[in-house]
C-alpha cells in the first residue's frame, strides 16, 4: 500500500492525498474523511521521514550528550524533552562518552538523518578537530562554555560562581586544603572553574587556599576506588569535593569501610546535588545546578533559531544559569538549621 493506491481507492488525486497528510485544512471535510477512511481500512501509515524531506523539516532534533546515567544528565534530557514535546518534536539521543571520534560520527549521522537541529552537551570538539569537511547547515546549541565546536548559541552553568560559593563556605569552617575529584571525560571545564572560584574566595577571605586535582570515573565505583587509593597512599584530603553525586556516595561507602569519619576526619562536598545527597548520613553539602532549566533553555534557543530563519547565525547568543549552594552536615556545619540556601 502506498500513496498512489490510497488515491486510487479514494477516487482522488495523489496531490489531494498529500494535502490530507500535510495540509488537511486545505481539503474539503468530506474528501478528507474519505481519504482517511481508506488509510484506516488498509492500516496505511505515511512515511513521515519522506514527508519531512518534502516539507524541509523532519520534526526531529538530536541531543549529543556524554552520558545518560547521571542525575545531572537525566535532568538535562528532561528539560530538552519537555520543550521538544510541546513543539511536537522527537528527540534522538546520542551518547558520546566524551569521545571526540564518537561525537564527530554522530554529527555526520545526524546530518544524513536531516534533523532540524542539534544540541551538544559538553562537546570535546573544536572545528580544527574536524578531520574531514562537515558542513552542518542547521541550528546548533552547545551546553557548555566551549565555543570552539562551531556553535554560536551557548548556554551553561556558572561553575566558577558555584566553586566560589562552595569554597567561601569551606573557608568559613576553617578548611584551607581542598581536593577535587572529577571525570575529565565528562567534566572537562570543572577543574579550571574550581581553581578560579577558589582563588576568588581566597582573595575575598584574605587567606590562602590550596587545590589538588584527582581523576576518577563519574560513578559510585569510581568514587569508592579513588578514595581507597588515597587511603592506601596516606593522602586523605582535608576536604574532598566531587564533581558528581555518585562519586560522593562511593566515597561515603569507602570511608565507612575504612573507619574514617565524615566530617571529623575529612569534609565531603559535591558539585551535583541530587535527592540522595539529603538522605544519606551525613547529608552531603552540595551545589544545586539547575540542569532541567539548562536543558529547557538550550531547547528554547534551538527552536527559536529553527522557527526564525532570519536570525544571523554568526551572532553569538549566550545564556548563563546560576547555582545554589545547599549547606548540610558533611563539611562540619554545626548550625541547627537542616539546610541553608545561599
Predicted region positions:
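A general structural signal for well-ordered alpha-helical segments in protein cores
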Residues: 3, 14, 32, 46, ...
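ATP/adenylate-binding site constellation spanning eukaryotic-like Ser/Thr protein kinases
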Residues: 14, 32, 58, 77, ...
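Short beta-strand segments enriched in small/hydrophobic residues
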Residues: 14-19, 53-69, 169, 177-184
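Short gly/ser/thr-rich secondary-structure transition/capping motifs
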Residues: 41-47, 101, 121-123, 252
Amino acid at each position: 500500500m502506498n500513496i498512489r493506491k490510497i488515491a486510487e481507492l479514494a477516487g482522488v488525486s495523489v496531490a489531494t492525498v498529500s494535502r490530507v497528510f500535510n495540509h488537511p485544512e486545505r481539503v474539503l471535510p468530506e474528501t478528507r474523511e474519505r481519504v482517511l477512511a481508506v488509510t484506516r481500512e488498509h492500516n496505511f501509515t505515511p512515511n513521515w521521514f519522506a514527508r519531512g524531506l518534502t516539507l524541509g523539516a523532519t520534526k526531529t532534533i538530536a541531543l549529543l550528550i556524554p552520558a545518560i546515567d547521571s542525575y545531572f544528565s537525566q535532568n538535562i534530557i528532561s528539560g530538552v524533552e519537555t520543550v521538544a514535546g510541546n513543539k511536537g518534536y522527537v528527540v534522538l539521543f546520542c551518547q558520546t562518552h566524551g569521545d571526540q571520534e564518537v561525537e564527530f560520527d554522530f554529527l555526520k549521522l545526524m546530518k544524513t538523518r536531516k534533523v532540524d537541529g542539534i544540541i551538544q552537551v559538553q562537546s570535546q570538539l573544536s572545528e580544527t578537530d574536524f578531520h574531514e569537511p562537515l558542513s552542518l547547515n542547521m541550528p546548533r546549541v552547545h551546553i557548555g562554555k566551549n565555543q570552539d565546536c562551531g556553535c554560536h548559541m551557548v548556554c551553561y552553568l556558572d561553575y566558577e560562581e558555584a566553586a566560589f560559593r562552595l569554597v567561601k563556605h569551606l573557608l568559613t569552617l576553617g578548611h584551607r586544603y581542598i581536593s577535587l575529584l572529577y571525570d575529565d571525560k565528562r567534566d572537562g571545564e570543572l577543574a579550571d572553574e574550581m581553581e578560579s572560584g577558589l582563588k576568588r574566595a581566597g582573595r575575598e577571605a584574605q587567606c590562602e587556599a590550596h587545590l589538588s586535582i584527582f581523576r576518577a570515573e563519574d560513578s559510585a565505583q569510581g568514587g569508592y576506588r579513588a578514595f581507597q587509593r588515597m587511603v592506601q597512599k596516606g593522602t586523605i584530603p582535608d576536604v574532598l569535593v566531587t564533581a558528581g553525586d555518585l562519586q560522593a556516595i562511593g566515597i561515603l561507602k569507602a570511608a565507612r569501610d575504612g573507619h574514617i569519619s565524615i566530617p571529623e576526619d575529612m569534609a565531603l562536598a559535591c558539585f551535583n546535588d541530587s535527592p540522595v545527597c539529603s538522605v544519606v548520613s551525613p547529608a552531603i553539602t552540595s551545589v544545586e545546578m539547575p540542569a532541567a532549566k539548562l536543558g529547557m533553555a538550550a531547547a528554547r534557543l534551538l527552536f527559536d533559531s529553527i522557527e526564525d530563519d532570519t536570525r544571523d547565525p554568526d551572532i553569538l547568543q549566550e545564556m548563563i544559569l546560576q547555582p545554589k549552594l545547599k549547606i548540610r552536615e558533611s563539611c562540619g556545619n554545626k548550625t541547627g538549621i537542616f539546610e541553608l540556601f545561599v
